[in-house]
Swiss-Prot record:
The gene is 42. It catalyses: dCMP + (6R)-5,10-methylene-5,6,7,8-tetrahydrofolate + H2O = 5-hydroxymethyl-dCMP + (6S)-5,6,7,8-tetrahydrofolate. Disulfide bonds: none annotated. Gene3D superfamilies: Thymidylate synthase/dCMP hydroxymethylase domain. The active site is at C148. Its EC number is 2.1.2.8. This is Deoxycytidylate 5-hydroxymethyltransferase. It comes from Enterobacteria phage T4 (Bacteriophage T4). Belongs to the thymidylate synthase family. The lineage of its organism: Viruses, Duplodnaviria, Heunggongvirae, Uroviricota, Caudoviricetes. GO terms for molecular function: deoxycytidylate 5-hydroxymethyltransferase activity.
Length: 246
């Protein structure tokens, strides 16, 4: 059975209440946020607030597939946030494709695929993204990139492959939607690759359970939460928003 976790809609409610009650947390840069500590929910929708940016999601996926640790290799214009967190050489830690496919990180995808292929009931089907040396690697050569995803565990139950995502930190608006798209891609690929290895398996993608140490909304996106609280709509452009967080 899947734990009776919260849903994305319930996460919206908790964040909406935090904003209404002005339960603010100031981050290391002095920016106001609202936050859920120890958030755990079933990721049953591809975004929480805002709207999907399919064009960027595809560009980021292509970069992940390349396994490049340099932001210049992101197809198209390099997003400002990646430029800001990169080292003086334009290098980062958080290419998630590198994290699961590179031999330098012990081929996490292949290890997980082999484990689940040999033992479908295993609790060892895990992809480890981060590493102990991240404590020092995050600020190498002027970088500011402490990987947000710790691990993703895959559990096969009742012919469904469930993903349990474990993160230290996740931005609700930009972070979640892009990370969800990546995790859905990896889950679907794992299902396909396991089925290709044995036609009798006939696995399907199950639930994605999302566990986050700090799930937060930055003040620049408070207007989205406020708009949802008033209307139930998850997105509005800032120019069309009317309210105290304009």
């Amino acid at each position: 059975m899947i734990s009776d976790s919260m849903t994305v809609e319930e996460i919206r409610l908790h964040l909406g209440l935090a904003l209404k009650e002005k339960d603010f947390v100031v981050d290391k840069t002095g920016v106001k946020t609202i936050e859920i500590i120890g958030a755990s929910f079933v990721a049953d929708e591809p975004f929480i607030f805002g709207a999907l940016n399919d064009e960027y999601i595809q560009r980021e996926l292509e970069w992940y597939k390349s396994k490049s640790l340099f932001v210049k290799d992101i197809p198209g214009e390099t997003p400002k946030i990646w430029q800001q967190v990169a080292s003086s050489k334009g290098e980062i830690n958080s290419n998630y494709g590198w994290a699961i496919w590179s031999e330098d990180n012990y081929a996490q995808y292949d290890m997980c695929l082999a484990e689940l292929g040999q033992n479908p009931d295993s609790r060892r089907g895990i992809m480890i993204y981060t590493r102990p040396s991240m404590q020092f690697d995050y600020n190498k050569d002027g970088m500011s990139d402490f990987m947000c995803t710790n691990t993703v565990q895959y559990l096969i139950r009742d012919k469904k492959i469930n993903a349990v995502v474990n993160m230290r930190s996740n931005d609700v608006v930009f972070g979640f939607r892009n990370d969800y798209a990546w995790q859905k891609y990896v889950l679907d690929k794992l299902v396909s690759d396991l089925n290709a290895g044995d036609s009798t398996r006939q696995y399907k993608a199950g639930s994605i359970i999302w566990n986050v140490g700090s799930l937060h909304v930055y003040s620049r996106h408070f207007y989205l939460v406020d708009h949802w609280w008033k209307t139930g709509e998850t997105h509005i452009s800032k120019k069309d928003y009317v309210g105290k967080y304009a």
